């Protein structure tokens, strides 16, 4: 690859007028006895006279060369070019190049000449390691990297509005806060409104938001739609904040490129790309209880860290909120048309001053195991259990009753209180019963495990 790169540099560009390297005036036979003594110190290396007989010092870059039999030839890699009546040795590539010695050379040929001289003195060879200046490199707007890297352009555009959200809980014994969970979100108003998933902020611990520039803020929960899994929180920041605008998810087409971005590790944004598998995967088809919403299915990887972050199109518009990963290659996002509806309803709720609500909370995200979904999972997950029904746990939220009881992602709830579970709705109905400890049987691999868990009441 290095040799190919050198060849490209050496062959790019066209000289004004190349002088011949052999021609009229040369003897029919070379007589070495007639040659002057061989040179001993040639900075640009040795070559032969144009007739190819006697050794002489080669002309270096920008030194004069000529047409006559006794005129010096250019060093290897240089061309004798005549401009304005004067012939000089020139490098086919006049672009700067960075050498392995950390110096910037005006051309590849100059670097090669310096390398040859260094080797003649017993030093290490200098090799080209980078086009352009050693400190800045070379930005070529016409190169394929800059012309066709549209994903990087999208990420650069949206990243400033993506935030990291961290939830804290208090340890009563030690009287200090510790991180309990985290997720992502994105800013939708210049005064600090942020959208994320409801499950990211459900436990209502203290929320801390960190932006990509490192600034941190305490956040307040403004509104939550548990059914749609959308939450609106707010920070107080000085000045106007960068925002993302919503696109229209109804215009999405299968096969369209999308970018999922999140900030699972504070300042370190993660980016995944994929295509839209379908823009209308029904919630009931996924086994999501009471769902009247279609989800966007994509093969862009969505995980717990970038959950709540934006799924954007190539125009940088938000067309969904990353929300659910079933397995590698099967992820789901809440469509932007549903987000738009939530924001309108939230405005109305705040205007009418509706109070908070309470609900029982277990801390899992699940889906029913339909025949179609079973087939998909068996294709994606090696050794998937031979189940025909149940509630598949897609995610266990940290610091929740589910995690404390020992439930894990990938478990399948097959019974509650001795009654078979056929869908996620059976689990949801059991959670709603007040003061009830749930006695579950879950299938983990090929083993059935009994687990007892008591849902917690939380306030929205």
From Swiss-Prot:
Name a GO CC annotation attached to this entry.
plasma membrane
List membrane-spanning regions.
Answer: none
Keyword Thylakoid (UniProt): no
Domain Kazal-like, residue spans: 74-136
* Alphabetical GO biological process terms: proteolysis
Q: Does the keyword Disulfide bond apply?
A: yes
Indicate where this protein resides in the cell.
Answer: Cell membrane; Secreted; Cytoplasm, Cytosol
- Residue span of region Serine protease: 183-343
Q: Domain IGFBP N-terminal spans what residues?
A: 22-92
Keywords attached to this entry: Cell membrane, Cytoplasm, Disulfide bond, Growth factor binding, Hydrolase, Membrane, Protease, Secreted, Serine protease, Signal
EC numbers on record? 3.4.21.-
The site annotation (Involved in trimer stabilization) covers: 148, 150, 257
Give the active-site positions.
Answer: 199, 229, 307
Domain of life, per the record?
Answer: Eukaryota
Q: Which GO terms describe its molecular function?
A: growth factor binding; serine-type endopeptidase activity
Q: Where is the PDZ domain?
A: 344-447
Q: Which cysteines are joined by disulfide bonds?
A: 26-51, 30-53, 35-54, 42-57, 65-80, 74-89, 91-109, 98-134
- Quaternary structure (record): Forms homotrimers. In the presence of substrate, may form higher-order multimers in a PDZ-independent manner.
Q: What's its job?
A: Serine protease with a variety of targets, including extracellular matrix proteins and proteoglycans such as biglycan, syndecan-4 and glypican-4. Through cleavage of proteoglycans, may release soluble FGF-glycosaminoglycan complexes that promote the range and intensity of FGF signals in the extracellular space. Consequently, facilitates inductive processes in the developing embryo, such as posteriorization, mesoderm induction and neuronal differentiation. Regulates the availability of insulin-like growth factors (IGFs) by cleaving IGF-binding proteins.
Q: Which PANTHER family match?
A: SERINE PROTEASE FAMILY S1C HTRA-RELATED (PTHR22939), SERINE PROTEASE HTRA1 (PTHR22939:SF13)
Q: Report the sequence similarity comment from the record.
A: Belongs to the peptidase S1C family.
Q: What is this protein called?
A: Serine protease HTRA1
Organism in which the protein naturally occurs: Xenopus tropicalis (Western clawed frog)
């Amino acid at each position: 690859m290095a040799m190919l790169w050198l060849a490209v540099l050496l062959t790019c560009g066209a000289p004004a007028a190349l002088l011949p390297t052999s021609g009229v005036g040369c003897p029919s036979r070379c007589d070495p006895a007639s040659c002057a003594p061989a040179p001993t110190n040639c900075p640009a290396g040795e070559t032969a006279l144009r007739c190819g007989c006697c050794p002489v010092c080669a002309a270096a870059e920008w030194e004069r060369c000529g047409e006559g039999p006794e005129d010096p030839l250019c060093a290897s890699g240089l061309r004798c070019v005549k401009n304005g009546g004067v012939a000089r040795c020139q490098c086919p590539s006049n672009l700067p190049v960075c050498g392995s010695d950390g110096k910037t050379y005006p051309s590849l040929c100059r670097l090669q000449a310096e390398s040859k001289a260094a080797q003649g003195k017993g030093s290490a060879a200098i090799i080209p390691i980078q086009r352009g200046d050693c400190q800045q490199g070379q930005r070529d707007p016409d190169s394929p990297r800059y012309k066709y890297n549209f994903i990087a352009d999208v990420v650069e555009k949206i990243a400033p509005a993506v935030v990291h959200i961290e939830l804290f809980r208090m340890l009563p014994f030690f009287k200090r806060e510790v991180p309990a969970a985290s997720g992502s979100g994105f800013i939708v108003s210049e005064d600090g409104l942020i959208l994320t998933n409801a499950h990211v902020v459900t436990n209502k611990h203290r929320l801390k938001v960190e932006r990509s520039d490192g600034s941190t803020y305490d956040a307040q929960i403004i509104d939550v739609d548990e059914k749609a899994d959308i939450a609106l929180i707010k920070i107080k920041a000085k000045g106007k904040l960068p925002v993302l605008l919503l696109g229209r998810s109804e215009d999405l087409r299968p096969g369209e490129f999308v970018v999922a971005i999140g900030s699972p590790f504070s300042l370190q944004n993660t980016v995944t790309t994929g295509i839209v598998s379908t823009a209308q995967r029904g919630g009931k088809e996924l086994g999501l209880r009471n769902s009247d919403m279609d989800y966007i299915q994509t093969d862009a990887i969505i995980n717990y860290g970038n959950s709540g972050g934006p799924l954007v199109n190539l125009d940088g518009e938000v067309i969904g909120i990353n929300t659910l990963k079933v397995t590698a290659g099967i992820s789901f996002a809440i469509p932007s048309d549903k987000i738009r509806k939530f924001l309108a309803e939230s405005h109305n709720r705040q205007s009418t001053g509706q109070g908070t609500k309470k609900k029982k909370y277990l801390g899992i995200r699940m889906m029913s195991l339909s025949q179609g979904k079973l087939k998909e999972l068996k294709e994606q997950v090696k050794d998937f259990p031979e189940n025909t029904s149940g509630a598949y746990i897609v995610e266990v939220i940290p610091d929740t009753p589910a995690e404390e009881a020992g439930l894990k992602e990938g478990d399948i709830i097959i019974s509650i209180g001795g009654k078979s579970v056929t869908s996620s709705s059976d689990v949801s109905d059991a959670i709603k019963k007040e003061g009830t400890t749930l006695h579950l049987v879950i299938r983990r691999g090929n083993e059935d495990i009994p687990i007892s868990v008591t849902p917690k009441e939380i306030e929205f």
